């Protein structure tokens, strides 16, 4: 926030410069005097209501989650993946990882997910979207998804049609997972997931390119 250049770079990689400018305009740095640097286990006390900040890299190196002990809720940002309520079926949820550019790290992400679960949250509050109960089935879905897309990237990232191949494989995987929870409205689901698949694919390819260039 003090120097938003990396944030701008990442957002432009996702949306493209033209769409970025339409959506966000100019990103103005925040004066350092207005910023609290929250290290791992930092406590923010709102007159007795304490929120604990937890370092959770994997989606991005700077990412943190926030633990609210009073409600046993973990605010997970993008670390705990993406889950849409309009894809739910009879209280069954489907969840999948966010691998958007530019700092995806699967090993760190899985470690962060287990770190979240050490708090035994009754609910995880996702940026995309809403609060869900982190059952073992949900956790397994998320971890399996990370392994699947990581292997996709390793297998296809250097192919000429890498983006299209990874998108197709990822979409098929997600639709099969959604079918397993009893949702058979696959055309609606395909449209719902299209943008996520495109953005996640960009992040996976960038991750593999970064590994190759290091």
Task: For the regions a language model picked out, list residue spans one by one.
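Metallo-beta-lactamase
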Residues: 1-57, 61-125, 129-133
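Short glycine/proline- and acidic residue-enriched helix-loop micro-motifs
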Residues: 18-29, 93-98, 185-188
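A short catalytic or substrate-binding loop motif that flags glycine-/basic-rich loops and adjacent residues
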Residues: 36, 57-60, 195-198
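C-terminal regulatory/interaction regions
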Residues: 151-214
């Amino acid at each position: 926030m003090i120097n938003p250049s990396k944030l701008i770079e990442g957002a432009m990689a996702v949306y493209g410069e033209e769409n970025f400018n339409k959506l966000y305009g100019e990103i103005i740095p925040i004066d350092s005097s207005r910023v609290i640097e929250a290290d791992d286990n930092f406590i923010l006390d709102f007159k007795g209501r304490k929120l604990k900040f937890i370092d959770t890299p994997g989606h991005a190196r700077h990412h943190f989650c926030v633990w609210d002990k009073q409600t046993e809720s973990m605010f997970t940002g993008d670390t705990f993946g993406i889950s849409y309520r309009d894809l739910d079926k009879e209280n069954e949820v489907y969840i999948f990882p966010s691998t958007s550019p530019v700092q995806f790290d699967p090993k760190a992400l899985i470690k962060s997910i287990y770190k979240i679960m050490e708090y035994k949250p009754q609910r995880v509050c996702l940026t995309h979207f809403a609060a869900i109960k982190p059952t073992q089935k949900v956790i397994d879905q998320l971890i399996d998804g990370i392994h699947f897309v990581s292997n996709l990237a390793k297998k296809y990232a250097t192919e000429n049609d890498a983006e299209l191949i990874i998108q197709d494989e990822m979409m098929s995987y997600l639709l099969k997972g959604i079918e397993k929870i009893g949702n058979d409205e696959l055309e609606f689901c395909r449209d719902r997931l299209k943008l996520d698949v495109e953005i996640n694919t960009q992040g996976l390819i960038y991750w593999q390119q970064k590994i190759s260039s290091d």
